[in-house]
Amino acid sequence: MGMGMEKGMTAYEAARERTVEENKRKMEALNLRHLSAAIAVAPKTPSPMKQKRRRIIEAAVVAPSPPRRSRRLANLPEVKYAEVAPDGAERMKRSPRKAIDSIYLATRGSISMEARLEAARKAEELESQLDPEFPSFVKPMLHSHVVRGFWLGLPRHFCETYLPKHDAIVTLLDEKDEQFDTNYLAYKNGLSGGWAGFALDHGLLDGDATVFQLVKPTTFKVHIIRATVDDGNEVTK
């Protein structure tokens, strides 16, 4: 680069231009431009070390062996066990599925909060009169306990303290000592299958209160307190 080109440049720009020109002269002297161009257009050949070996797997052909037969039956003709229906035979028809009986859903008149609290108060009073040797708790009935869902959750602390740590059959005794088996789900702390039968058989309704008394490791005595509707009449069955 001549001195004329350095006019109008700063000292830094002039030094940079001189460095670029010097590098160009060195590259021309070493013929680097032509070498890089030749490498760029040269065909690429794969390395033999990177080539994957193809594994040829021959399919094994196994000739089917004849069925094993005893010497006593070797000369007898082969028996074919094919199910052939006799001529004119008709297939058996399945009997139509019976319609599922509708589940009785207990209903009552309107129930006030005062009636619910009164039933719970009577249940707590009854519990206080029971033998303290047998643990117990009060359980007010809700809609999900006695209608369709029929899932009865039990107090967690009571379950963890007194009931089995695994699923078990828990028996419910009514006031006439009639037994009803239910499925106790330990991981959910509640009664599932069998509870619906007890609730429907005893006409439990939303708002009633119950007292569960554990008389045996997996047996409850159940006392029922009926709630009253707004007209003052107690629902009985």
From Swiss-Prot:
Keywords, ordered alphabetically: DNA-binding, Nucleus, Transcription, Transcription regulation
Q: Pfam families under this entry?
A: B3
Q: Where in the cell is it found?
A: Nucleus
Indicate whether Iron-sulfur appears among the record's keywords: no
Please tell me whether the keyword Nucleus is annotated for this protein.
yes
UniProt superkingdom? Eukaryota
Q: Can you name one GO molecular function term for this protein?
A: DNA binding
User: Which positions make up the DNA-binding region?
Assistant: 137-228
Checking CDD domains in the record gives: B3_DNA
An annotated GO cellular component: nucleus
The protein here is known as B3 domain-containing protein Os03g0184500
- Source organism per UniProt: Oryza sativa subsp. japonica
